[in-house]
Amino acid sequence: MLHSGMVLAAPQSGSGKTTITCALLAAMKNRKLAVRAFKSGPDYIDPMFHRQVIGVPSRNLDTFFSGADQIRELYGYDRESFSYSVIEGAMGLYDGLGGTQKEGSAYHLAQTLDLPVVLVLDARGMGRTMVALLAGILQYDRDHRIIGVILNRTSEGFCRTMTPVIEEELGLPVLGCFPVQKSLHLESRHLGLKMPQEMEGLRQQVNQAAEKLEETADLDRMLQLLQSWALLHAFRDGKTKLPKLQEPGKDKGVLQKKKKQQEECPVIAVAKDEAFCFYYEDNLRLLEAYGGKLVWFSPLAQEKIPEEADALLLGGGYPELCARQLSENVSMRNSIREAIENGMPSVAECGGFMYLHESMTDEEGENWPMAGIITGSCHNRGKLVRFGYVNVTEQTSHFLAGKPVRAHEFHYYDSDNNGESCVAVKPVRGTSWTCIHEDDRNWWGYPHLYYPSNPAFVEHFVQAARLYHRERNAK
């Protein structure tokens, strides 16, 4: 069977994509189908839901972060181990950079990977208007990628009423509906959805949703459409088999760089708990590809960093929700501060950057002492401070080898000491600001970097960890 993929997209955010994606993944898993998941765009939280449902990593695919060749490489990685790929879109189907560009949109990703699109339409409070709405969306679909629609938040009876109208007037298959499920509600907070570990009984809720989707949607028809697309496009290209995008052992791709056997594999201690949990899977894989050995630790629960650590990676998350616990873990704060002051290389992004400050206010406005590496404090501004994609360049070259790295920001907190080592520039409007504290061994700031957009960042960080390892062993 040919590998089949799809992009599950919607006209706008809040249409129920994540709920239906999770229900679909669970239903496919219940059918014993080998399925994997991706998220279009830079979001961290949706892939966490995918992982909870299917038990394998879900990765981001983003046409701003990566060029077409790299996108195909990332999608091709491990593809032969799975029969299906489900990519959850971001925002509206055609919404890219700045809301006005194609680049970065779910549709652009579908074009890049030559995949079909299944729409999720929030049909609440609509009748024939949904035909007009779908007609407009189809008019923009010049590649004819949209192969079907699922009517969300509507009854089975009304779906049966509207199906012949939509199919006869638009020629668009209606793949069923998904009625409102009071038992399944993915709650949100200021950074988006609440994290899956915060939701009691998530697996049971998603399995119930999967059972309902099997009842109210025609998944057999959807899978047949995906297989037909894969066959048609394989034969169109003169092939009866999808091409291998990577040759094992010969690959020069960004995630498959061979480790130099003669060099040490430095240990990179990665913060991972309720406070620090935002990591791009491909960032972690690239650190390993360049020779780093990743070990996990919890700034919330453990007393100190791992003894074998040669470098620290403090990712994003929700440290403001755990400010008291982080502050009261004095031994960990001291351990991190002493390690960095003694020369251990470190990267801290967004939430990790906040943790390195002298203090941080929690959501109630109470101020808590933090690690004390960066002079200043972080406070909730009550509104989005910076949001969207940026290109980050250094004022003086340390980590980036003279090239930009692509990144994303989304935060309501701000620092009174954001740093001035780099300049961040928004790709459409050209708005810019200074950011980042860095030297040859440390990089601290709000932007969430996508490392494969500039692998020199990882190469420099791992080499700094390797140098620290040698220095420590020489003492």
List where the protein language model places each region:
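A short helix->loop->beta-strand "cap" motif at the edges of active sites that frequently abuts
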Residues: 115, 172, 341-345
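Structural motif
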Residues: 7, 86-88, 118-120, 150, ...
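Phosphate-binding active sites in nucleotide-utilizing proteins
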Residues: 252-253, 258, 264-330, 334-341
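ATP-dependent carboxylate-amine ligase catalytic core
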Residues: 2-19, 25-113, 121-148, 156-160
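Internal gly/pro-rich beta-alpha loop/helix module
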Residues: 127-260
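C-terminal and late-domain segments of enzyme folds
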Residues: 110, 219, 263-264, 276-289, ...
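Cysteine-nucleophile active-site neighborhood
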Residues: 294, 319-396
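Beta-strand->loop->alpha-helix junctions that form or flank phosphate-binding loops
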Residues: 39, 174-182, 293-301
